[in-house]
Design a protein with these regions (language model features):
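Transmembrane alpha-helices and adjacent helix-loop boundaries
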Residues: 1-248
């Protein structure tokens, strides 16, 4: 079979069937964008919860993170695929299970999963911001929510950009789990091609297409890491009365 990797006829057949690969590439990109948005919003919310004074909010964040970090993503997606339609039938009162589109399964699966990891990144970033920033903001009349929104989170995202991009990379690669539920993604299309023709060229094309998505992100991570090492650690917030605040 390995000798066939260099077979011109097999490559010709592969190139003649690139349409499904590009369709899968498009589906994967859509799942990546939607999953990233979901994981960023939910992860930020959970990250803030984990640093609040409320025991209830901290507990919600902790339970969520522990559950998603300690159960496999394929199991989570398969569970949503099998149980989700019955759950929707129960809450909507439909006569039969409500079908969930593979795209929805995909972005919910990777989005909810990576929100747990992003929340930990957010929490670490928030804890890296001097606590005096929050106290100084509140002394200037900011509510706690306003202090998070205008003071803490902007600094947090500057600190955590490199690890955040790493999570984006992992999310891209984890979209391949959609192949388990016939999601129409890149991995699913590649599996179909290899099953039909028996040519490993399908997986080579799949790898190259994932590389097209992931390599620019990897370069962005390296660039951000260099920038973060060059950037001065002090943060000036002139105009808000919060510049040069030291950690309490």
């Amino acid at each position: 079979m390995l000798e066939g990797l260099f077979d011109a006829d097999r490559w010709s057949t592969t190139f003649q069937n690139m349409g499904p690969f590009w369709e899968g590439f498009g589906v994967t990109l859509q799942v990546v964008v939607a999953g990233l948005l979901l994981s960023l919003v939910l992860g930020t919310l959970l990250g803030v919860f984990s640093t609040t004074r409320s025991r209830v909010l901290r507990a919600i964040s902790r339970v969520y993170v522990e559950f998603y970090q300690n159960t496999p993503l394929p199991v989570q997606v398969l569970f949503m695929y099998m149980a989700g339609p019955q759950f929707l039938q129960a809450i909507t009162g439909a006569d039969q299970p409500v079908r969930i589109a593979p795209f929805v399964l995909g972005f919910l699966g990777v989005g909810l999963y990576h929100a747990a990891y992003i929340s930990e990144v957010i929490r670490t970033g928030i804890e890296a911001v001097p606590r005096g920033q929050m106290e100084a903001a509140q002394s200037q009349g900011f509510t706690r929510a306003q202090a998070y929104w205008y003071i803490v989170l902007p600094q947090t995202f500057k600190i955590i950009l490199p690890p955040l991009c790493n999570q984006a990379l992992n999310l891209v690669k984890n979209t391949s789990v959609l192949a388990l539920v016939a999601g129409g993604d890149l991995m699913y299309r590649s599996d179909n091609f290899v099953s039909l023709y028996g040519y490993l060229q399908g997986y080579i094309v799949c790898c190259l297409m994932y590389f097209i998505i992931c390599f620019p992100l990897a370069m962005l991570v390296q660039w951000l890491q260099r920038r973060s090492q060059e950037r001065p650690r002090g943060v000036s917030l002139a105009g808000l009365g919060l510049d040069n605040v030291e950690e309490a």
